[in-house]
Amino acid sequence: QDLCRALERVQRAAQTKVTSNTNNGFFISAEDGKVEFQANDYSIGIRTFCEADVEERGSVLISAPHLLSTIKMMPSGPVVMEQKKGESTVFFKAGQYNSHFPTRDTAEFPLVTEIDHTFHVNMKCKDFAEMVNLVSFAASTDAKNPIFTGILCDINENVFTMAATNSHRLAAREISLEEIPTGKGNFIVSASILQDVIRLLPVGEDDMMEISWASRHVAFSFGETYFLSNLINGVYPDYKRVFPSSFDLHATLDLKDFEEAVRFVSPISRDMSYKTINFKFENGTLEAFEEDPDIGRSETSIPAELDGADVKITFNCTYVEDILKHSKGEKIILHVKKNGPMVVEQEEDKAYRYVVTPMRGR
């Protein structure tokens, strides 16, 4: 089990296709009662270890696409790993199960070494994971504009903010840090890489992690694992300016009612070219509807506490559904601007905000 978990931690960077460069696969070294595992694909490098009975120190580089799946299928209990001197093969044995894999020259593997970064911050793993989950969905998946595929991490004194956008919607979450970081600044990390990081985090209530960064790299240290990633170069949009300072309407809705209304209209929206949904705020109600002559029409209305002018406005239905999937509590608050962005605010979590730009309706 320890061997499987260690291989799983570094798998993301292992480049297990045999046709790639020399650094592909798993670098494994054994000494002083532990086995260290590394993988490096030049965009990320991961290093972890597990305890072991080491009879003789040594290291191997295994370019084995099926190594992890093979180890997973071995019976529970001790696994013996052995490479005989002068041979380019490594053997794994568990009970009556035996496998061997070819090895490559370890001298050409780019080792993952800890970088002495200037800036450091410590925080709870669960807080970091929550922040990533609450904003990453808003990032773009279009590699043509790499800035928007990333998440901005903005650290200013004891306030840590994450923001993600695809230029049509933006999600931002901030927390107050228990420890003051060694410096302030911001950096951009791929949203998919941060998802990889949080999949590896320990889940204990008080488990801590360290984040350290410099001009080109960010490192995440937690438990037995060190995760190093390249940063995305470029200037991120000023997320604070995206949120309007004034609105024409404030609407407080029952979250469950709003979810059901959007869900009811969404089948029509999903079949339309621009996947739009219309909202009409008036007379203490919110009407949600969409129609297309070739598809049909769906509409419903729910009670709403309204403060401001009547507004009719259109949004991308998927973008509205996305924030509702990440919302909690009994109520949700919409701050609406005629022909302008709508800010979605959580009644029970003011530090989590979402803004979405309108679309042209019928």
Please annotate each region the language model reported.
Residues Q1-R362:
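Structural preference for solvent-exposed beta-strand-turn elements
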